[in-house]
């Protein structure tokens, strides 16, 4: 039996990583009686090579196209070494970001042509798409307030407010274009209210 692939998306500060950890725990409890596992991973990263590329991508300045190509290089390794093998075993994969983040950040935020990203997506993913994508939607000014003084920001977190306005807009455009895959979650609400939504989603999967 093939597993399912769930991705968590949203701009920095939307709280997706916190909710991902809780969601994964709940899913593990549901799948354990079936002898199935939950693989929790992230992008950029997810493999030894991917984690090294993550450090480069998050902290070094580079040409726009170089950044996108490194994102997809890391993703190809991630798919081949982690995601595809897990799905073929019947396990479930939960990833903190996937290709939608590249469209949102490099496409929406940085302005790279969407057509170029689509070509890379087809080549690298070979048809692989998430079963469900949970988009934690939050106004950029609220997200920025949450991140303030939290830690030393990486190069993306340090981007301008307008960068995140464009990034959020591209996320929402993609969600509107694929309503069967995306679940948009209002991340401005209280944690318990968001978890109720996640519980409903778990029951439907």
Curated annotation (Swiss-Prot):
Reaction equation(s) it catalyzes: dTMP + ATP = dTDP + ADP
GO biological process: dTDP biosynthetic process; dTTP biosynthetic process; dUDP biosynthetic process
Lineage: Bacteria, Pseudomonadati, Pseudomonadota, Betaproteobacteria, Burkholderiales
Keyword presence, Cytoplasm: no
This protein's UniProt keywords: ATP-binding, Kinase, Nucleotide biosynthesis, Nucleotide-binding, Transferase
Protein name: Thymidylate kinase
Gene coding for it: tmk
Stated role: Phosphorylation of dTMP to form dTDP in both de novo and salvage pathways of dTTP synthesis.
Domain of life: Bacteria
One Gene Ontology MF term: ATP binding
Entry annotated with the keyword Chloroplast: no
GO cellular component terms attached to this protein's record: cytosol
Family under the similarity heading: Belongs to the thymidylate kinase family.
Organism, as annotated: Ralstonia nicotianae (strain ATCC BAA-1114 / GMI1000)
EC number: 2.7.4.9
Any Pfam family: Thymidylate_kin
Residues annotated to bind ATP: 10-17
Bilayer-spanning residue ranges: none
